[in-house]
């Protein structure tokens, strides 16, 4: 069983939900980014998504867009993020997933990128702009390297398309809570529960919810309908505040840990 599968199996056996934390690789710089990843793990994150910065991130909200810009300005790119994953893997046993747009992968070459991602210790890959109709090559290659290709589905995804996406998935299903870009929100739309229920009827894979999750009450609202929640912008905002307000590093790491622990307590 893969590391991702093991985490969700353990969570299910204890009646708990997985807390998946997102961070942009190289934000605000590579050295501190590694410290952030280790802090997320120590605070209780069950799985960590590491974003690969890209200049045209269509699915990212303003907070994560700015994180990508900071990472790019600090010299982070595919090579650096793969090295970051490798450094994190030397110290951590939890699953690490790369979230990347398709373009950087194509620039390196699909097979080469997947080979190096697996060699660095990644467990899976999320490609937000990969259409299911064009994903066969990547899906087959990823499986050959032991990498899960984790798809995104939304409330607006049609039923036939949803069935096709879910049928080809591995790792877990990433359900998007809203149509649009990432970012913390005050509330979640009612159709989120319908989406989660629908997806769970179609697959035995874990079903997780992201986009807009950042408050304990949101997790309490939806946790009975999913296997995990994904928190991104609410954590990245803390890093942005560090940069803008010149906070002490230790204080930032403390705030990140507290946020994870607070969300973990209700998951």
UniProtKB/Swiss-Prot annotation:
Protein family: Belongs to the TrpA family.
InterPro entries, per the entry: Aldolase_TIM, RibuloseP-bd_barrel, Trp_synthase_alpha_AS, Trp_synthase_suA
Subunit structure: Tetramer of two alpha and two beta chains.
Pfam families named among the record's database cross-references: Trp_syntA
GO MF, one annotated term: tryptophan synthase activity
Function: The alpha subunit is responsible for the aldol cleavage of indoleglycerol phosphate to indole and glyceraldehyde 3-phosphate.
Cleavable signal peptide: none
UniProt pathway: Amino-acid biosynthesis; L-tryptophan biosynthesis; L-tryptophan from chorismate: step 5/5
Keywords of this entry: Amino-acid biosynthesis, Aromatic amino acid biosynthesis, Lyase, Tryptophan biosynthesis
Active site, UniProt feature: 49 (proton acceptor), 60 (proton acceptor)
Keyword Amino-acid biosynthesis: yes
Known catalytic reactions: (1S,2R)-1-C-(indol-3-yl)glycerol 3-phosphate + L-serine = D-glyceraldehyde 3-phosphate + L-tryptophan + H2O
Name of the protein in question: Tryptophan synthase alpha chain
Entry EC no(s): 4.2.1.20
GO cellular component, one term: cytosol
Organism from which the protein derives: Carboxydothermus hydrogenoformans (strain ATCC BAA-161 / DSM 6008 / Z-2901)
């Amino acid at each position: 069983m893969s590391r991702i599968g093991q985490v969700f199996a353990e969570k299910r056996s204890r009646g708990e939900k997985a807390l998946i934390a997102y961070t942009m690789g190289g934000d605000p710089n590579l050295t501190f980014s590694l410290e952030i990843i280790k802090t997320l793990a120590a605070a209780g994150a069950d799985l960590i998504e590491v974003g690969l910065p890209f200049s045209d991130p269509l699915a990212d909200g303003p907070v994560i867009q700015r994180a990508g810009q900071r990472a790019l300005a600090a010299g982070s790119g595919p090579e650096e993020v793969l090295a970051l994953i490798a450094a994190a893997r030397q110290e951590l046993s939890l699953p690490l997933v790369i979230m990347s747009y398709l373009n950087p992968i194509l620039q390196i070459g699909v097979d080469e990128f997947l080979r190096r991602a697996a060699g660095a210790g990644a467990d899976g890959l999320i490609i937000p702009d990969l259409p299911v109709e064009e994903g066969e090559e990547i899906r087959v290659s990823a499986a050959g390297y032991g990498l899960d290709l984790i798809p995104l589905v939304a409330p607006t995804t049609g039923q036939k398309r949803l069935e096709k996406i879910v049928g080809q998935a591995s790792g877990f299903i990433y359900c998007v809570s809203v149509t649009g870009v990432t970012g913390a929100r005050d509330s979640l739309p009612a159709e989120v529960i319908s989406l989660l229920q629908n997806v769970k009827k179609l697959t035995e894979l874990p079903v997780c919810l992201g986009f807009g999750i950042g408050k304990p009450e949101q997790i309490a609202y939806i946790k009975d309908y999913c296997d995990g929640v994904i928190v991104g912008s609410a954590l990245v905002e803390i890093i942005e505040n560090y940069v803008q307000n010149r906070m002490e590093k230790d204080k930032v790491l403390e705030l990140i840990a507290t946020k994870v622990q607070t969300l973990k307590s209700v998951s």
